[in-house]
Regions:
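Charge-rich, low-complexity segments
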Residues: 2-67, 168-202
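A glycine-rich, hydrophobic loop/mini-helix early in the fold
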Residues: 42-98
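Extended, folded cores of ATP/NTP-driven motor/assembly subunits in large transport
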Residues: 52-58, 104, 108, 131
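Short, flexible loop/turn elements at secondary-structure junctions
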Residues: 63, 105-107, 153
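Conserved short hydrophobic interaction patches
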Residues: 77, 118-125
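Short, solvent-exposed secondary-structure capping/transition elements
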Residues: 86-87, 109-114, 123-131
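Extracellular-facing segments of soluble proteins and assemblies that are Gly/Ser/Thr-biased and enriched
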Residues: 89-117
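Helix-rich interaction surfaces within compact, conserved domain-sized segments
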Residues: 123-196
Length: 202
């Protein structure tokens, strides 16, 4: 299993480098997230937003042995890929009992490949209904700004927290992000569905 997953990661990373993503009407979560591998260029050129190399996938835990086994397989797969892809990872369970798998890598392409690989493993193991969101961290030199992929909506949306304690966000900057890349990837147009995720641990 570990060898298969690592080979899948290598093939996926190669395919992202060649294709560059950019599917505007993706049929799957994989295609949707893959589109970020080219869309991020628009964030850099238009808004000076750069990837920090940090991303995460958020999963609702299930109190069954199969879920723990799946988590162990994902950790083995990521451990095996650390040297080849120059990435690190950690897992945490937050106060709401959600599992976070946090990835740190040198390039956004490796972030995308790792998140896709984890998501597909979760789906293959029968826990697709537990997938909540993937989060990609960007920064303009001042504050963190996030792109969130919601697995229930099958779309991205921006999130720019300003004050975590007061639950304040910068809607103006979020709209700028949407304007910059709405044509580059599947984007949620309904602002009421831009659900905040506070205290993102990336």
């Amino acid at each position: 299993m570990e060898v298969y997953e690592l080979n899948f990661f290598k093939r996926l990373r190669k395919s992202i480098s060649v294709s560059g993503g950019g599917s505007k009407k993706p049929k799957t979560d994989t295609e949707a997230i893959n589109s970020l591998s080219s869309a991020y260029v628009a964030l850099e050129t238009k808004l000076n937003l750069k990837s920090t190399g940090r991303s995460a996938i958020l999963i609702k835990r299930a109190a069954v042995a199969e879920f723990d086994e799946m988590k162990y397989e994902i950790e083995r797969f990521l451990e095996a890929g650390k040297a080849d892809f120059d990435l690190t990872y950690r897992t945490i369970v937050d106060p709401y009992d959600y599992l976070w798998i946090i990835i740190v890598s040198k390039t956004i392409e490796d972030n995308v490949a790792a998140i896709i690989s984890i998501g597909e493993t979760i789906e293959q193991k029968g826990f697709s209904d537990k997938l909540l969101a993937s989060i990609f961290d960007f920064n303009d030199g001042n504050i963190a700004q996030y792109l969130i992929y919601n697995y229930k909506l099958d779309k991205f949306y921006p999130f720019v927290p300003v004050n975590e304690q007061q639950k304040r966000r910068n809607h103006g900057d979020e709209l700028k992000i949407m304007s910059a890349i709405a044509d580059e990837l599947p984007f949620e147009k309904e602002l009421s569905k831009w659900y905040p995720i506070w205290n993102i641990p990336v």
